[in-house]
Amino acid sequence: EKRNVGMVFQSYALFPNMTVAENIGYGLRIRRAPVAALRARVSEMLAMMRIEPLADRRIEQLSGGQRQRVALARALAVRPRAILLDEPLTALDAKLRDTLRLEIDGLLRSLGITAIYVTHDQAEAMALGDRIVVMDRGRVAQVGTPREIYHRPANRFVAEFIGSLNRLTGAVQGGVFVCAAGTLPWQTGGPAVREILFRPERTHLIPPEGASLRGTVAAAFFLGDRTRLFVDVGEGQPVIVENGQRREFVHGEAVGLQVEPGDVFVL
């Protein structure tokens, strides 16, 4: 209260003995806001969250998404300098999470309120964050924009924690990286490099004939908008490929792999 910081808890922490309107106005009431100002602010928040019809309902009568909106309205009603959101979407189903994530982003940006958003969902952090702080066992591993964190991870932990990661082991010989799967033009690091890293979505399938990197399909999972392939390249860990083609893949099918040198990094 003294720091003027709002908070949205993972469990929402709404008061079951109060109506929706009373919950939203609670922070203003304990600050002894004038009654007229309190009512006006509650009406404003109800409209902003599009929950006016719920004003007189009890908390047990609300769905998970409605409770989340009430909790956010309560935190914003006091016009905080900053707001802390502690995994506010964890308890919701995937489709509702996507909808509310978009609403929260638009609302906080329109109000110009600084938000600290705690989440274990990497996609959520990438979608909402202007700056991301990656924590490793209580210590800051990296601070940066979503693009910096994803494309230029500071260390192995960050690279593996944010998104999926492919790796190939081998050695640099004559300007190319040589591994069990074949060769890759090399321009990233020095001759001492023994492992290269790259993202699944930057790994492309090409015909195996003439491909410098080759493997066989170990597994293929159709996910609707794409197929996730696990390609055996002669190493312990398969290479993951996110492929948008509509064709089906069969176990043991030979495929070629293409990775642009600029999409490869070393740590």
Feature locations, PLM:
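Short, flexible active-site-adjacent loop segments at beta-strand->alpha-helix junctions, enriched
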Residues: 1, 18, 261-263
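Nucleotide-binding/hydrolysis machinery
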Residues: 161
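Short, flexible, glycine/charge-rich loop motifs used to bind or transfer phosphoryl groups or to couple energy/partner
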Residues: 2, 73, 106, 122, ...
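ABC ATPase nucleotide-binding domains
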Residues: 3-6, 10-157
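Small-residue-enriched segments and motifs
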Residues: 102, 156, 170, 215-218
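Non-catalytic connector elements of ABC transporters
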Residues: 165-167, 176-267
